[in-house]
């Protein structure tokens, strides 16, 4: 396990971690945006949303997400879809390799997991086009596993909370933020905890000097708050 002290990061004690979890989740329960993929625990639906949200804005994704699941309501439907229909469903989102990889992953699920979406982080991470972040998101949201989902928003929040002086854009530093999240993640509500941090990063702890610190529910324990 990574020793965070070697990177100049001092973690909170158990009481402060518990308080942080409560405060963040209370805020999320009150303030979270009502998004269609937050109304389900279906791993297939969550997977579709996570892939679509890569490099695409939330409001743009919503109609595509709803149409895609209307056209391909199950993993089997996606695995067997004609390429022309598949690409038509994705038209306008760009980065077509995303949907091609999704179909390959759906075929993996049919062949290797008897058509059942895998329910462990390790097996989810074996699917084509799924990296550590997406595997963590699906594992925690759909299956309640205490697996962090560490994306750019989450790394920015962590960097400010703990005054981490390592570039979040450098892939080799991801392990630092992963180690922080391994400690912080709420074991009882891991999916909501991950989504709460993503929501905080997307709506309050904004990049490029426009963070809304006065609206932040966890400003009291943030080293970056001045």
Residue positions per predicted region:
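N-terminal amphipathic/basic-hydrophobic helices that include classical n-h-c signal peptides
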Residues: 1-6
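Catalytic cores of DNA base-excision repair glycosylases
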Residues: 8-15, 23, 27-214, 218-221
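Acidic, metal-coordinating catalytic segment for phosphate/diphosphate chemistry
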Residues: 224-225
């Amino acid at each position: 396990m990574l020793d965070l002290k070697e990177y100049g990061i001092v973690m909170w004690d158990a009481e402060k971690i518990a308080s942080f979890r409560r405060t963040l989740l209370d805020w999320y329960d009150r303030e979270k945006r009502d998004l269609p993929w937050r109304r389900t625990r279906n791993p297939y639906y969550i997977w579709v949303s996570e892939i679509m949200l890569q490099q695409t804005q939330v409001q743009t994704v919503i109609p595509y997400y709803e149409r895609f699941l209307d056209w391909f309501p199950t993993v089997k439907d996606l695995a067997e879809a004609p390429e022309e229909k598949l690409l038509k469903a994705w038209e306008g989102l760009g980065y077509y390799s995303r949907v091609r990889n999704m179909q390959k992953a759906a075929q993996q699920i049919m062949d290797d997991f008897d058509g059942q979406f895998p329910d462990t982080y390790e097996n989810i991470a074996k699917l084509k086009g799924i990296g550590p972040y997406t595997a963590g998101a699906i594992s925690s949201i759909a299956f309640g596993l205490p697996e962090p989902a560490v994306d750019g928003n989450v790394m920015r929040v962590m960097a400010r909370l703990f005054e981490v002086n390592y570039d979040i854009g450098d892939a080799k530093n991801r392990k630092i933020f992963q180690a922080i999240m391994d400690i912080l993640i709420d074991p009882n509500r891991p999916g909501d905890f991950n989504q709460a941090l993503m929501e905080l990063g997307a709506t309050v702890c904004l990049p490029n000097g426009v963070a809304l610190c006065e609206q932040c529910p966890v400003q009291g324990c943030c080293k970056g708050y001045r």
